[in-house]
Amino acid sequence: RQSNLCLEIALPTKPLSNVEDDEGEIALCTLSAFNLGAINELDDLAELSELVVRALDALLDYQDYPLPAARKSTMNRRTLGVGVINYAYYLAKNGVKYSDGSANGLTHRTFEAIQYHLLKASVDLAKEQGRCPSFHETNYAKGLLPIDTYKKDIDLVCEAVSYTHLTLPTT
């Protein structure tokens, strides 16, 4: 079973038999965001990623956990969530629009840079402190990155959104 309170991503969970059950898992994700409006160069993301990964990781060790299952899941998985704010301003400041497709290239480059720098910061931290205990359960342990799990069918949906109806292939 998988869930996340904000429902933006799916995180592993295991059922609890009671609130003190330490065999269950409650998914928690410690969050932060890059203020894209303050980013001038994509290279700025390298240092910022290092800082945010280390800060959030340190927070995992000293925050309070109301239930053993929440602590267990967090300590074993060390899940971090890093998003963005000020996206619309970032696009405007760079002279592109979301509505006409001119932002597609910048958006792709920006989020590719964010993903790269966050992964690099996480790898650097793992080299220093070791992998999280549940690393072997992840796609990363299999050598898969998020881009490797991309479903091409989504392209059909994105290309067809201007139609009044849509039928996806059944094969």
Annotated model-derived regions:
Residues N76, L80-P133:
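Extended, well-ordered alpha-helical scaffold/bundle regions in very large, multi-domain proteins
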Residues T164-T170:
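Conserved small/polar residues in nucleotide/adenosyl-binding loops
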Residues N18-V19, N76, V157, L166:
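Generic recognition of flexible, low-complexity loop/linker segments
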Residues L119, V123-Y163:
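Short glycine-cluster motifs
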Residues R1-T74, V84-L91:
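Function-dense linear segments that define catalytic or interfacial modules
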Residues Y65-M75, S102, G130-Y140:
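Short coil/turn segments at secondary-structure boundaries
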Residues L36-E41, I85, A103, Y140, ...:
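Short capping/connector residues at structural and topological boundaries
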Residues A38, A55-L67, A113-L125, Q129-P133, ...:
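Short secondary-structure junctions and interdomain/linker hinges
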